[in-house]
């Protein structure tokens, strides 16, 4: 469960290491974001020669949460931390690689590229 001011790790090779959620997209009163939701983030920590710089604002999709996601069969998929993948204005991933596992819930028309780049889909 991600809300404003939440810190997330970045699970791609854009050069960003840490981001902070500044807005949960999808309605004026929307408070929390889960796996597969799009949020606005500010880059808080970045590699020196990365594709993104500290302080820049991007869209991102949440790919892992410590809260987890409940499946239809009753199982719960949780992770050790929260992670996101940075997106451009067309909601396509900026990076060319994804690090760590992602969940099956991302298998929608919008994020198939992320699922295909991920090393493991849970």
UniProtKB/Swiss-Prot annotation:
HAMAP family: Ribosomal_uL14. Part of the 50S ribosomal subunit. Forms a cluster with proteins L3 and L19. In the 70S ribosome, L14 and L19 interact and together make contacts with the 16S rRNA in bridges B5 and B8. The gene is rplN. One of its GO terms (biological process) is translation. Transmembrane segments: none annotated. PANTHER family: 50S/60S RIBOSOMAL PROTEIN L14/L23, LARGE RIBOSOMAL SUBUNIT PROTEIN UL14M. It holds the Pfam family Ribosomal_L14. The keyword Ribosomal protein applies. GO terms for molecular function: large ribosomal subunit rRNA binding; structural constituent of ribosome. Gene3D superfamilies: Ribosomal protein L14. It comes from Methylibium petroleiphilum (strain ATCC BAA-1232 / LMG 22953 / PM1). The lineage of its organism: Bacteria, Pseudomonadati, Pseudomonadota, Betaproteobacteria, Burkholderiales. NCBIfam families: rplN_bact. One of its GO terms (cellular component) is cytosolic large ribosomal subunit. Belongs to the universal ribosomal protein uL14 family. InterPro entries: Ribosomal_uL14, Ribosomal_uL14_bac-type, Ribosomal_uL14_CS, Ribosomal_uL14_sf. This is Large ribosomal subunit protein uL14. It comes from the Bacteria. Binds to 23S rRNA. Forms part of two intersubunit bridges in the 70S ribosome. Keywords: Ribonucleoprotein, Ribosomal protein, RNA-binding, rRNA-binding.
